[in-house]
């Protein structure tokens, strides 16, 4: 059935709100963003927002459930670095660039805080009604899965490394680093971010070169 002009316009407006929400989520986290901010970013009035969504919580549900939010933040940046350097990145270079990107978010966009999702989950009321924030954190894990797969495709890490398990480890380490910085009142450092993103390898002191760990998977956890 052919859509009329009203339906087409309504769908376009809806998509504009969703796109604006994705960008605000990445740039500023979600808690400090108001309905006015979302409407302004989408190019519409606050009234237009309420035509499509009941509340900000309702909007978050649509944002997470109706749109795949894999923005490929990390691997997109690594691809860009490879194009600019006109050569393949080494494991050390890839880890440094990934840490550079995430640390810049941490420093320049404090409200975004990589783990703001996890830190705010216990108090944010939407969690009591749905699992939207859990999904938000899962999407962050998926970003790191893509990062690990990117490294594996280039044979920079051992093929037997489990992307899903290791991505959770990375997120857990980054969570701890940022939460610890709040508890101790000391800013996280670039070095700590680099360490979190370099759990795949250590240095072979005898030959002074990166030595890839045999594995980082659940299957070998108790061996």
UniProtKB/Swiss-Prot annotation:
GO terms for molecular function: DNA binding; DNA-binding transcription factor activity. The keyword Chloroplast does not apply. GO terms for cellular component: protein-DNA complex. Coiled coil: none annotated. Pfam families: TetR_N. Keywords: DNA-binding, Repressor, Transcription, Transcription regulation. PROSITE patterns: HTH_TETR_2. Residues 34-53 bind DNA. InterPro entries: Homeodomain-like_sf (IPR009057), HTH-type_Tx_Regulator (IPR050624), HTH_TetR (IPR001647), Tet_transcr_reg_TetR-rel_C_sf (IPR036271). SUPFAM superfamilies: Homeodomain-like, Tetracyclin repressor-like, C-terminal domain. Residues 11-71 form the HTH tetR-type domain. Disulfide bonds: none annotated. Gene3D superfamilies: Tetracycline Repressor, domain 2. This is Uncharacterized HTH-type transcriptional regulator YwcC. It comes from Bacillus subtilis (strain 168). The lineage of its organism: Bacteria, Bacillati, Bacillota, Bacilli, Bacillales. The gene is ywcC.
